[in-house]
Amino acid sequence: MTGTVYKSTGSWYTVKTSLGTVYQCRIKGKFRIQDIKSTNPVAVGDVVDFETETVDNETTGIIHHIHDRENYIIRKSVNLSKQTHIIASNIDQVFLLITINNPPTFTGFIDRFLVTAEAYDVKTVLLFNKIDTYDEETLDEVRFLAHVYRKIGYDCIGISAKTGKNIEKVKAMMVGKISMFSGHSGVGKSTLVNAIEPSLDLKTKEISEQHMQGQHTTTFAEMFDLSFNARIIDTPGIKGFGVVDMDKEEIGDYFPEFFALKQQCKFNNCLHIDEPKCAVKEALDHNEIAFSRYRSYLQILEGDEETYRTDNWE
């Protein structure tokens, strides 16, 4: 039988067939997939082949094959820096939720996420949430950031999960697609999903005052069928986002505004640091490229995993 993985709890996987039958499945032995050293061999969104077995009137499945993934979102595991974690696979688009405060989402985090999405060919839409709570100065920050990312080619939408602002617009973009929702803990993912589909009634928790971060309410990624011909993958809140092994020469290719200028650089292997006649550095000097983007690029290039969490708005 063939089905799609809707939920992973580490050892058991919830798999739904095209007929809508749900099986609890596990894997036997070790799965090695394309040399990906991931902590989870099977991810939500995977299409798998499995066989059923019945013991004591309980039917479960054993997964024996994973179909090739069209794409996936992957990040470094928090505890095992050399290992990776596949958050979800076979995604049509990702909605990355961003909040300016309560908790703050820094540009370094946004850019790391976007680089990974570009590398694995996943379309990303930026949702600026909680705009009903912002004063004019904070709204100016939203407008500035939206301008930076729209200029590069990303869709940016200001929303409020609480008031419903632009929720219908987001729903219209989801029809007929598998959409993953991601972002820091506390940015309002569960509240947004509940606004999109109230019957799901996902748990929400308030922001931790001490750390200005949300309490984790989603422990594992999970896919849901929605009433308007759409599927959603809700993911755990992410604190940091480590970019997975990329050659230094290729990182710039996943910054679309850098890639567009690459041919104009004097050297075809230009890293855009201190090489002469670098088109990217010239564009930066003329304010055609945002400094925050260039700073993120340098941090990824240097393998800097920590400082991006504390950078300032500039």
Outline where the language-model segments fall:
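Helix-rich effector regions associated with P-loop NTPase G domains
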Residues: 11, 37-55, 67-87, 123-124, ...
